[in-house]
Amino acid sequence: MNSTNSGPPDSGSATGVVPTPDEIASLLQVEHLLDQRWPETRIDPSLTRISALMDLLGSPQRSYPSIHIAGTNGKTSVARMVDALVTALHRRTGRTTSPHLQSPVERISIDGKPISPAQYVATYREIEPLVALIDQQSQASAGKGGPAMSKFEVLTAMAFAAFADAPVDVAVVEVGMGGRWDATNVINAPVAVITPISIDHVDYLGADIAGIAGEKAGIITRAPDGSPDTVAVIGRQVPKVMEVLLAESVRADASVAREDSEFAVLRRQIAVGGQVLQLQGLGGVYSDIYLPLHGEHQAHNAVLALASVEAFFGAGAQRQLDGDAVRAGFAAVTSPGRLERMRSAPTVFIDAAHNPAGASALAQTLAHEFDFRFLVGVLSVLGDKDVDGILAALEPVFDSVVVTHNGSPRALDVEALALAAGERFGPDRVRTAENLRDAIDVATSLVDDAAADPDVAGDAFSRTGIVITGSVVTAGAARTLFGRDPQ
């Protein structure tokens, strides 16, 4: 695959400093240690361990206010938009998101950039003795042999400690999974953001959407005495979910701002490299906003982020955020792995869609914002996902699909994915490849052949494309193959 680079990603380039081999080795060692703990997909409904660790660390999460983001789809994009807006308003930010695409350092960002491998390792080593103490206490608790701290709990503690050390003015905190029992819920955020909720992580959160909403609504917490009410900023939801979220907001005495009621997307126009928006915020109308991301769903993410930042700064009917700062913030937004272009001629996109809702948003964007005449999907999906739902959403926009394996032990094997794809696409439209690199080569051959077809030719390669999708792991692995640095 001549157009890609198979070397390891430069885990520190986003900071402007290239990490040394020793620093990379230390980072890998820390990751190995963290991987010995409970994985992020395993939930124990308790905040006892993370709360105890925060107490030992001096409650770093209380040293700055936070904007807390839960939901099913769009959390990371909203978090990155909030980060960019707050930065444009001259506040120092810390941001923690999950999972990472390429390097674990992406999970902890300060001033909009991932911390360096050296900082990541130093932060872990700083809290490591206290983590060991909590492990011992938990395992000895009441003689029951409780669990040690999970990987995500330790990562969350690292982020909160790094933010306090920086120090930051505002933390932008994305929930890992769920909300109520998520390790991030040791904060008491003045602004709780809920992106659209759908069914995902069925093995861990269940298949009852009202129950899922109840878990995610757990981040809407009562404000401390003497503080302004918490504000719940809620994106578009189905009625059953909205009912749960509003009930939780009442319980927490939280003010509520809902999309299409208190804020809305008024207008969007497709533009080169993204879209131009007119948004109704809590403080008024913001016009001529260029967002360098594709898709109607990103416009809704943008207005959700705007309302969240307005709520944080107290904007409302009598006070609007600075319009130039808002425009500058949105113009600076990046969201790696979200319909991100890797190359042109033929066009290659990667997208981290990993559930039916995400796949539907991807398909809608491809159908409405591009003029492809022949499009090939490269697909690897994790085995615990709704594979058929993802395939059903993508089938109308992909002429062919190449199914493969992204290297994750959780990924569905190629044979099983090919069988599922054949049922949706028909066997003639399905190809297989053992690994992602080979799959991209197969897809490239397919678009080369299509470009030579007189029914497609005219704009040739500009009318053919490849989309690599199916999971965050797939998008991250592809990003590394194309030589992109972690962001």
UniProtKB/Swiss-Prot annotation:
Gene3D superfamilies cross-referenced by the UniProt entry: Mur ligase, C-terminal domain, Mur-like, catalytic domain
EC number: 6.3.2.12, 6.3.2.17
Pfam family, one: Mur_ligase_C
This protein's GO CC annotations: cytoplasm
Cofactor binding summary note: Binds 2 Mg(2+) ions per subunit.
Deletion consequences: Cells lacking this gene display impaired growth.
Record annotation: effect of changing residue 153 to G: In a spontaneous PAS-resistant mutant strain; complementation with wild-type folC restores PAS susceptibility
InterPro entries for this protein: Folylpolyglutamate_synth (IPR001645), Folylpolyglutamate_synth_CS (IPR018109), Mur-like_cat_sf (IPR036565), Mur_ligase_C (IPR004101), Mur_ligase_C_dom_sf (IPR036615), Mur_ligase_cen (IPR013221)
Residues in the signal sequence: none
Binding-site list for Mg(2+) 2: 201, 203, 384
Chemical reaction(s) catalysed: 7,8-dihydropteroate + L-glutamate + ATP = 7,8-dihydrofolate + ADP + phosphate + H(+); (6S)-5,6,7,8-tetrahydrofolyl-(gamma-L-Glu)(n) + L-glutamate + ATP = (6S)-5,6,7,8-tetrahydrofolyl-(gamma-L-Glu)(n+1) + ADP + phosphate + H(+)
Record-listed ATP binding positions: 74-77, 301, 338, 351-354
Protein's GO biological process: folic acid biosynthetic process; folic acid-containing compound biosynthetic process; response to antibiotic; tetrahydrofolate biosynthetic process
Key word Ion transport present: no
GO molecular function: ATP binding; dihydrofolate synthase activity; metal ion binding; tetrahydrofolylpolyglutamate synthase activity
Keyword Ligase: yes
Miscellaneous comment in the UniProt entry for this protein: Mutations within this gene in the H2Pte binding pocket are responsible for PAS resistance in M.tuberculosis clinical isolates and laboratory strains. FolC-linked PAS resistance is mediated by altered substrate specificity that results in the failure to generate levels of H2PtePAS-Glu that are necessary to inhibit DHFR (DfrA); therefore, a blockage of PAS bioactivation causes PAS resistance.
Domain notes: Is folded into two distinct domains, an N-terminal ATPase domain and a C-terminal Rossmann-fold domain, which are joined by a flexible linker.
Membership in a protein family: Belongs to the folylpolyglutamate synthase family.
Subunit structure: Monomer.
PANTHER family: DIHYDROFOLATE SYNTHETASE-RELATED, FOLYLPOLYGLUTAMATE SYNTHASE-RELATED
Protein's job: Catalyzes the addition of a glutamate residue to dihydropteroate (7,8-dihydropteroate or H2Pte) to form dihydrofolate (7,8-dihydrofolate monoglutamate or H2Pte-Glu). Also catalyzes successive additions of L-glutamate to tetrahydrofolate, leading to folylpolyglutamate derivatives.
Name of this protein: Dihydrofolate synthase/folylpolyglutamate synthase
